[in-house]
Amino acid sequence: MLKSAFWGGIASGIMVGIGGTVYLSCENKVVGATLFSVALLVICLLGFYLYTGKIGLFIEKPDKLSAFALPVGLAGNAIGAGLTGFGAALVKPALVETAKKMCDAKLEGGMLKGLVAAVFCGILMYAAVKTYGTKGTLVGIIFCIPTFILCGFEHSVADVYYFTVASLAKFDPMSIVFILVAVAGNTLGGWLLPVLTGLAKGKEQGNGAK
């Protein structure tokens, strides 16, 4: 499972990086955000490992092996997204300045804003993956991904890609802190809906037993 999480994590990071590339390349942000969905579509359909999709499912059925797989998969995600960032900057040098402006705005917004934005992204990522896993529909992916992008919510793996591209203009050490904050926010957001769902079901069962 750890091997699968690592290599599948790299594959997911690459796909997220490709999604980030098309988003940065589009002048029309609605079009770019919609096309970004190709990343999660491929990840879900091919069964790759994406931390932001797995963390919410983990809290539903936690186990030791999955707990070890999460950081391994996240490392793979970061490697894949980072390598894609370097490759995209080589193929499309104009993206560097675009990414730098975006990342400068992220850092200027502060860590608290980044954390809250990442929580909202985590909620939408869980919703997208859960609806695909339980209902077999891609509707959640097609709508949730553009929604978090157009809202300006923070996806930690996508941020690895954006900050990697931006670093080719100028590296800011605070970008690493920002990404870690985004990971924390995505984790909290990914846990929120399953925890609330569990509490709701527990309440219903308690009422039914009376």
Positions of predicted regions on the chain:
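Alpha-helical transmembrane segments and their helix-helix packing motifs
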Residues: 1-210
